[in-house]
Amino acid sequence: MKLYKILGVNCFHINSVSDAKDFIKDLIVSENGGYSLAINAEKIMIYAKDSAFREIMDGSVLPIPDGSGATIGMKILYNIKSIKLDLPKTIFESANENNFSFFMLGATEKVN
């Protein structure tokens, strides 16, 4: 996976689910942690105006295209097509394939 910029916003080009799984595995094995961010047109526009939001977006270790604004932006700016990644499903599959375990925290005790 290669990192590109759309109007200054970091966004990975995701060529395949396999590439994403490899990236996720490497991220987990490295034990560095981090968070993902779904990049869409609204977030790209807010990025230019809100410095606190910009800092959050810049800190993402896995900014992925999510929505037509990001995917069309990559096509127009770089002439590449990025797949639409079902990130939760991909993380579950990667965890299963690599015998990783994880903990999910819900918003309330009832959903834990």
What are these regions (language model features)?
Residues 1-88:
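N-terminal nucleotide/polyanion-binding subdomain common to many enzyme families
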Residues 70-112:
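Conserved beta-alpha
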